[in-house]
From Swiss-Prot:
Known EC number: 2.7.7.6
Transmembrane domains' residue ranges: none
Name of protein: DNA-directed RNA polymerase subunit beta
Record note on quaternary structure: The RNAP catalytic core consists of 2 alpha, 1 beta, 1 beta' and 1 omega subunit. When a sigma factor is associated with the core the holoenzyme is formed, which can initiate transcription.
Classification via InterPro entries: DNA-dir_RNA_pol_bsu_ext_1_sf (IPR042107), DNA-dir_RNA_pol_bsu_external_1 (IPR019462), DNA-dir_RNA_pol_su2 (IPR015712), DNA-dir_RNAP_su2_dom (IPR007120), DNA-dir_RNAP_su2_hyb_sf (IPR037033), RNA_pol_bsu_bac (IPR010243), RNA_pol_bsu_CS (IPR007121), RNA_pol_bsu_protrusion (IPR007644)
HAMAP family the UniProt entry points to: RNApol_bact_RpoB (MF_01321)
Nucleotidyltransferase listed as a keyword: yes
Organism: Mesorhizobium japonicum (strain LMG 29417 / CECT 9101 / MAFF 303099)
GO biological process: DNA-templated transcription
Domain of life according to the entry: Bacteria
Function of the molecule: DNA-dependent RNA polymerase catalyzes the transcription of DNA into RNA using the four ribonucleoside triphosphates as substrates.
Key words of the record: DNA-directed RNA polymerase, Nucleotidyltransferase, Transcription, Transferase
Length: 1378
């Protein structure tokens, strides 16, 4: 048995229960963000120039800009980015935006225009680089740093550009008649609606304005009435034959019609169909096959038809009848009178073909193109007199001008597919053919041919990601700039200026800033834990600019649609008003270049499943039959069953196996990342699964993270892609490691131009956006070998590279003295004592010293009227020490502000004149700890404006920072030296040197000892004969010198940044930030939850000895109510409990075997147990090939409990759980005999007990509890404010008043409505009375009564109080004491 593999213990090993092999690699989970923005910026110019997309396309669409006279033109040449001024960490610390300066090369061309001929000749060309503002860059984790905070740009779902056909579902008309409509939606530009009204006339609307007949629109496109009719209708020719007419027999036309009179064959004269009979499709076909060519028609048969052409007297030019006229008795006479031998009529039978366009033409008042253009002009610009030129220009700019109208490539592709056109996707404007095809399709729909579109189908909705949103925003900015440039070009002497003088980049920069700062889609990143970050980046919102609004979104838009399968998660969406409008991308989904969401499928060729994976969008998928991932296969990859369950065109059906051509790649491809983390998801009710997905995102990172015993196999993927855990960029050997960084000497990808050292900085106790703590811990030791992609450091909520949002706790499902009524949770004191659910929270407090009108504010320790006791935590600069324990009301930063001078009395003036200047008044505006917050100061940062003298504290912080930078530089230098000289030594040893330092004998062979005789800096003087080797040495030397220079330069830059002042908001001289960390232990009132939507609030923390315990004395950690399971239907939690129990039992068994191995030295039983627990297959670890040391290391990891993975929809079954319980030596019922901790008596029945994974949620009682006695009041009503943030009071509302009224508590009620609320004078008097120790007071008039009186007066109703004197003194109830 070849035991070749080793296990380093740096990752968690799981037993997989999944049966379905994973073929497709899961795409990087934040690829959506990164790929989109990279495509927009294209920082590095590819060979052959940048393609026309992203930023390049924006510049190309706005430039060239010409002035109004055409005598000069500004062209765009190229753009490039310089390096960002500050790196990511510096931006976070200094509240800056992480951005790179954008340089654009512009070319100004000045023309000479010949006044006589108007010919242009180039007079002058100038090129120049122009700075166009800063462009925010994306961090490696797909976020942006704007003003020091991390933000995410959420992708938006919107209706795809293109054409959509729909009807009103019978709502508009009382008869319930369906009114069909078509809408052409461009990416930008005017919308075109074409719709039927209740009279079956077709109208067009532009931009939802007044409607016009659609024929007017067609006339404006240059068609006349006859052309319109011939486009929409076929013609039938009546040919005169003696006393009757002949009309050709057309099979299609006659099928389904009822014969009014006998149908007679025009050639033979026989009756082929009798009067009153309906002609079926079969009959019509048979008649055609029998050779029926034409049928007889009488003059009467012409009645009711419509003429297809004008009837003209060619001699006089007189028009007798016009095309489209209906033939009635009168017109028939005229017709027969003209003696026409051939009459062409429109093929309209009112059954298969309706007369809608002809009727529309009939009601249309416009006769010519000019009339139609004028009509459209009046609709679009009411009140302006039209001329032909302005009307033509306006009409062309609506749909046919690429600057005003853009269908986009997507729109063109969708339009081609829907209307079966063949235009290139570079044709981005409408064409006459497009509009005609839309009208034709709409009329066919009305005639009952074809289907309407489903707007909720994902083939009709697309995703706009960061890059595209940014592109649109930047285009807006550039267009604003364009106007200014045009005006400046016309008003300035163009010969003397450079492009720089014409451009003011402010509008463009402002558009970017506005988008990142205040757009609805630019959101403050949810950084509670790594899962919430990843989910936020994968979110799809239907809200936002150009999207839906909460109020207007109906039920259909929010609902799950069959096309969501594998694209959008049907489970994860918020509860509340946004339900269904905010969605999450499914695990394997990706967004294609047109913005449609694609899902992967495996191909089935000739009935055999292949490993070829294709990505299809919803439109492409509709044509296929897709089998589920869990369909049963034989060993050759064919389907076992004759009929297979599959999806086709949105329906689930049983199809013969020959018809199935695709299969899902994985059972978890239909759910999102958060839902894929829930084990036994298939056993949970969907509503609870939704809560479970959402609550995992609120789990607070704990001090000790612990991965779940029962996972799904998704945990390492989330930890890796979120960037919380750090993976090695390339393989190598760990050279140095401490808490703040890891240094790895690379052994692969050794590029001569690159440094051979990778340094990974770890984040230590950083504050996240949600005030949770971000802390990374190294997993490697010095000398460890690592491979590319290995996890070398854990982050918040990760353990050994696995996502670890909570802890495994021992749960008993039983009632316990009513303390778990209504989902409450009973905890053991052990949880608190052992810091199981303890988390660290960091708050940031910021204080600014400004320059005020009365003088500058000052940060100082010298604060008026403050005792020395209150200043004990401050240093001489007035800033709190690091490590100080602070509580509510403590001063963090002392600050004084100049007070306004009060006017002086003459006496004061005299005294001041005699005794000189008295110190001007200052008031204390120090920053104090807010109520209800305790903690320890962990970090202080001081920022000074340029040129403001730094205080002692700022200097100390600066010195520490520079020392840290110097240490980093020295360490890097040492590693670089060691690395380079090791490589140099490898090249030189054993070679013959032809030159060397002083005292070296030429021609001798170099050895390690020879080299050691000389200082390392002299080794470069050795030369070898082999030219190739010698050039390698020189290259190494050059690389070494360059690296050294770069290192020093980087150090100098950073020191310079630290020493120079900081950029501050206007008026701010100095800013201090204090970070206070607090350890939050579990306490009653905190919210906890499992992964199955089983949430509850901690009701009581009980001493360990009172908790129920097992026979061996193990106490339960947590007691949950069994009644929380049946009605909620989330049975997954019970299965998880059983499996967790088996995991712990197995771990205990392995632990005992390790102990025996350590005592007796026989590893075979341990190896055997591990091999039987984890049988060899392609998903499990190859335990057979492990050496003994690895087996022990693995067993130590499993001691607390083994880890298993049960993937969603492909997880462990009941039988698997039973087998595992048996392996662990436990009862297969999963129930145990428990004993009451207080009496020691056994409980009557056995109790389900096991390990469940519980999370502590970010709803902590400390952040919610709040009390007030006196605080701020609202200015108008003088009532106390509301809410904890405003330090408000409790509202005594309408219903509470009723309660006091019901009890007859008159005085209490009076106090509530007056002195405890808004009786201003009364509440002051009460305060004074209490201070005096007196308890008599009177209630006055509430301020809200005065507000009411004033509001009535503002309506013109004068309300006055009658001041009649009350004779009697106010009644006072005798005190009980009297």
């Amino acid at each position: 048995m070849a035991q070749t593999q080793t296990f380093n213990g740096r990752r968690r090993v799981r037993k997989f229960f999944g049966k379905i092999p994973e073929v497709a690699e899961m795409p990087n989970l934040i690829e959506v963000q990164k790929a989109s923005y990279d495509q927009f910026l294209m920082v590095d110019e590819p060979k052959g120039g940048r393609p026309d997309e992203g930023l390049q396309a924006v510049f190309k669409s706005v430039f060239p800009i010409s002035d109004f006279s055409g005598s000069s033109m500004l062209e765009f040449v190229k753009y490039e980015f310089e390096g960002p001024k500050f790196d990511v960490d510096e931006c976070r610390q200094r509240d800056l935006t992480y951005a790179a300066p954008l340089k654009v090369t512009l070319r100004l061309i000045v023309f000479d225009i010949d006044e006589d001929t108007g010919a242009k000749s180039i007079k002058d060309i100038k090129e120049q680089d122009v700075y166009m503002g800063d462009m925010p860059l994306m961090t490696l984790n797909g976020t942006f740093i704007v003003n020091g905070t991390e933000r995410v740009i959420v992708s938006q779902m919107h209706r795809s550009p293109g054409v959509f056909f729909d009807h009103d579902k019978g709502k508009s008309h009382s008869s319930g008649k369906l009114l069909f409509a078509a809408r052409v939606i461009p990416y930008r530009g005017s919308w075109l609606d074409i719709e039927f009204d209740s009279k079956d006339v077709v109208h067009a609307r532009i931009d939802r304005r007044r409607k016009i007949p659609v024929t007017s629109l067609l006339m404006a496109l240059g068609m006349d009435g006859e052309e319109i009719l011939s486009t929409f209708y076929n013609k039938i020719t009546y040919v005169r034959a003696g006393d009757h007419w002949r009309i050709p027999f057309n099979v299609e036309r006659f099928r389904g019609l009822k014969a009014v009179g006998d149908l007679v064959d025009a050639d033979t004269g026989e009756i082929v169909v009798e009067a009153g009979k309906k002609i079926t499709a079969r009959q019509a076909r048979q008649l055609g096959e029998k050779g029926l060519k034409a049928i007889k028609a009488t003059d009467e048969d012409l009645l009711g038809n419509y003429l297809a052409e004008d009837i003209v007297n060619y001699a006089t030019g007189e028009i007798f009848l016009e095309a489209g006229d209906e033939i009635d008795e009168k017109t028939l006479k005229v017709l027969l009178g003209t003696g026409e031998q051939e009459i062409k009529v429109l093929d309209i039978d009112h059954v298969n073909v309706g007369a809608y366009i002809r009727n529309t033409l009939n009601v249309d008042k416009n006769e010519s193109r000019q009339d139609a253009l004028f009509d459209i002009y009046r609709v679009m610009r009411p009140g302006e007199p039209p001329t032909l030129e302005t009307a033509e220009a306006m009409f062309n700019s609506l749909f046919f001008d690429s600057e005003r109208y853009d269908l986009s490539a997507v729109g063109r592709v969708k339009m081609n597919m829907r209307l079966e056109l063949k235009a290139e996707d570079t044709v981005r404007v409408l064409r006459k053919e497009d509009i005609l095809a839309v009208v034709k399709t709409l009329v066919e729909l009305r005639d009952g041919k074809g289907e309407i579109d489903d707007i909720d189908n994902l083939g009709n909705r697309r995703v706009r990601s960061v890059g595209e949103l940014m592109e649109n925003q930047y285009r807006v900015g550039l267009l604003r700039m364009e106007r200014a440039i045009k005006e400046r070009m016309s008003s300035i002497e163009i010969d003397t200026v450079m492009p720089q003088d014409l451009i003011n980049a402010k509008p463009a920069a402002a558009a970017v800033r506005e988008f990142f700062g205040s757009s609805q889609l630019s959101q403050f990143m949810d950084q509670t834990n790594p899962l919430s970050e990843i989910t936020h980046k994968r979110r799809l919102s239907a809200l936002g600019p150009g999207g839906l609004t909460r109020e207007r979104a109906g039920f259909e838009v929010r609902d799950v649609h069959p096309t969501h399968y594998g694209r959008i998660c049907p489970i994860e969406t918020p509860e509340g008003p946004n339900i269904g409008l905010i969605n999450s991308l499914a695990t394997f989904a990706r967004v294609n270049k047109y913005g449609f969401i694609e899902s992967p499928y495996r191909k089935i060729v000739d009935g055999k499943l292949t490993n070829d994976v294709v990505y299809l969008s919803a439109m492409e998928e509709a044509k296929h039959h897709v089998a589920q991932a869990n369909a049963e296969l034989d060993k050759n990859g064919g389907f076992v069953d004759e009929f297979v369950i599959c999806r086709s065109a949105g329906e689930v059906m049983m199809a013969p196996r020959e018809n199935v051509d695709l299969m899902d790649v994985s059972p978890k491809q239909m759910v999102s990342v958060a839902a894929a983390l829930i084990p036994f998801l298939e056993n949970d009710d969907a509503n609870r699964a939704l809560m479970g997905s959402n609550m995992q995102r609120q789990a607070v990172p704990l001090v000790r993270a612990e991965a779940p015993f029962v996972g799904t196999g998704m945990e390492p993927i989330v930890a890796r892609d979120s960037g919380a855990a750090i993976g090695a960029r390339r393989g190598g050997i760990v050279d140095q490691v401490d808490a703040t960084r890891i240094v790895i000497r690379a052994t692969e990808d050794l590029d001569p131009g690159k440094s051979g050292v990778d340094i990974y900085r770890l984040m230590k106790f950083q504050r996240s956006n949600q005030n949770t703590c971000i802390n990374q811990r190294p997993l490697v030791r010095m000398g460890d070998r690592v491979n590319k992609g290995d996890i070398i450091a854990d982050g918040p909520s990760t353990e050994l590279g696995d996502l670890a949002l909570g802890r495994n706790v021992l749960v008993a499902f039983m009632p316990w003295n009513g303390y778990n009524y209504e989902d409450s949770i009973l905890l053991s004191e052990r949880i608190v004592a052992d810091d199981v659910f303890t988390s660290i929270h960091i708050e940031e407090f910021e204080v600014m010293a400004r320059d005020t009108k009365l003088g500058p504010e000052e940060i100082t320790r010298d604060i008026p009227n403050v005792s020395e006791e209150a200043l004990k935590n401050l240093d001489e600069a007035g800033i709190v020490y690091i490590g100080a324990e602070v509580q509510p009301g403590d001063i963090l930063v002392g600050k004084i502000t100049p007070k306004g001078e009060s006017p002086m009395t003459p006496e004061e003036k005299l005294l001041r004149a005699i005794f000189g200047e008295k110190a001007s008044d200052v008031r204390d505006t120090s920053m104090r700890m807010p109520p209800g917050t305790f903690g320890t100061v962990v970090e202080v940062r001081v920022f000074n404006r340029h040129g403001v003298e730094k205080d002692e504290r700022a200097m100390a912080i600066e010195r520490e920072e520079i020392e840290r930078l110097a240490k980093d530089r020295d360490d890097e230098q040492a590693i670089l030296d060691r690395n380079v000289y090791a490589r140099l030594s490898d090249v030189l040893v054993g070679k013959e040197a032809i030159a060397g330092p002083k005292g070296f004998k030429k021609g001798s062979t170099l050895s390690k000892d020879t080299l050691d005789e000389y200082p390392r800096s002299q080794w470069w003087q050795f030369a070898v004969e082999n030219e190739k080797l010698q050039s390698e040495l020189e290259a190494l030397r050059g690389q070494y010198d360059d690296s050294k220079k770069a290192l020093e330069q980087r150090f100098m830059d950073k020191v310079e940044k630290v020493q120079r002042g900081d950029e501050m908001p206007p008026g701010v001289m100095k800013m201090v930030k204090v970070f206070v960390a607090v350890k939050r232990k579990m306490q009653p009132g905190d919210k906890m939850a499992g992964r199955h939507g089983n949430k509850g609030v901690v009701s009581r923390i009980v001493p360990v000895e009172d908790m129920p315990f097992l026979e061996d004395g193990t106490h339960a950690d947590i007691v949950l109510n069994p009644l929380g399971v049946p009605s909620r239907m989330n049975v997954g939690q019970i299965l998880e409990t059983h499996l967790g129990w088996a995991c712990a039992g197995m771990g205990k068994k392995i632990g005992e075997l390790i102990d025996t191995y350590k005592a007796a030295g026989d590893i075979k039983p341990l190896r055997k147990t591990l091999e039987s627990f984890m049988p060899a297959n392609d998903r499990n670890e190859p335990i057979r090939e492990y050496d003994d040391e690895s087996i022990v290391r693995l067993s130590e990891q499993m001691r607390r409990g083994v880890s298993i993975a049960t993937p969603v929809f492909d997880g462990a079954h009941e039988a698997d759980i039973n087998i595992m319980l048996e392996q662990a030596g436990l009862h297969t019922s999963g129930q145990s005999q428990l004993y009451d901790g207080r009496t020691g008596e056994p409980f009557d029945r056995k109790v389900t007990m096991g390990y469940i994974y519980m999370l502590k949620l970010h709803h902590l009682v400390d952040d919610k509890i709040h009390a007030r006695s006196i605080g701020p009041y609202s200015l108008v009503t003088q009532q106390p404010l509301g809410g904890k943030a405003q330090f408000g009071g409790q509202r005594f509302g309408e219903m509470e008043v009723w309660a006091l009224e019901a009890y007859g508590a008159a005085y209490t009620l009076q106090e509530m409505l007056t002195v405890k609320s808004d009786d201003v004078a009364g509440r002051t008097k009460v305060y004074e009375a209490i201070v005096r120790g007196d308890d008599t007071f009177e209630a006055g008039i509430p301020e809200s009564f005065n507000v009411l009186v004033k509001e009535m007066r503002s309506l013109g109703l004068n309300v006055e109080l009658e001041n009649t004197k009350l004779d009697d003194a106010p009644v006072r109830l005798p005190d009980a004491a009297e």
